[in-house]
Amino acid sequence: MKMKIQALVALVTLAAAPAFAQTEIKVSYQPALYWALPFYVATEKGWWAEVGLKPVFSTFPAGVPQIAASASKSWDVGGTGSVPAVLGAVRYNLLTIGLTNDESAGNALLATGAKADGFLKNPQSIKGQTIVLTANSTGDYAVQSCLAKWGLKKSDVTIKSMGQAEVISAMSSNNADLGGLWAPNIYTMEEKAGAKVICSGKDAGAIVPGALVARSEYAKEQPQNVAKFLAVYLRAWKWMSTHRAESVAMMKKFYDVGGVSISDASMNKEFDTRPVYDLAGQLKVMNRAAAGSDVDKWMTQIAEFMKATGTMPEVPPAAKYITDDFMKMIDKDPKLKAFANQAN
């Protein structure tokens, strides 16, 4: 998707959006996740109103039902995993408009405490085992990347798909020895059930980004709102990067609402192990000046994984659904750029 940036920049002005003239924007996400925290922070700080937006939130337990809901226009923009983002591009024409974070270390294969050491010493012993996970998710991608690292194929194990809550329940009750989880569910299993990470996406050399997405129809009709949405999200990360203690306190409240309770140490681990991108960082990883951008490469690798698993027939061209147009709109608008980069 290619847009005339200069023509659109004029549409993105903070001055034209006083607090009393807010435009509704439907935002979707998955609750109690690190990359969704900026939505909560921005709401608590009142930053949406500063750009003339009024968010209406909808939440989903995982990416597949989330992207399916876009077909009925129940949401306009949001955050999701990279695997559902690619699937959403193929099935529902969703655009990837930025990244939420690098969650390569936050998606992993875990084993129960009684079995973990054995699997770590001899990964080949996983052959023939059952792994419970959420299919077509970043957790699924991480698990299968780990299997490939050990020379194992999907056909070498039995995969049972279920929601993350069911994965936690199955492993906690010793009805499953191996499970694919994403943070903070990883920390819940470690702290409450003594499970251990035996391999993360990062360990397997897989880059697992989170994606900021938009319905293509909405993005075409309301490009200025998409840019403002991104600016609010970026400002929240910028603020959190310089206010760790307050951010952790807000994370605790946000996670509590989503039914997740983890230690302060694990909450800090979320910040320490999951890099995020400011405006300059987003533009850098989305820059196609060379032979394709980093984001193109990462998402195409994920698409190739999905094709190999039979989830979709072909790998979609990255340029068809990944666009930095809206990040560029922010960069071209002095007021919106200053807003996105504000750390206080």
What are these regions (language model features)?
Residues 61-64, 79, 133, 137-138, ...:
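Soluble non-cytosolic domains of exported or imported proteins
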Residues 221-313:
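Secondary-structure end/capping motifs
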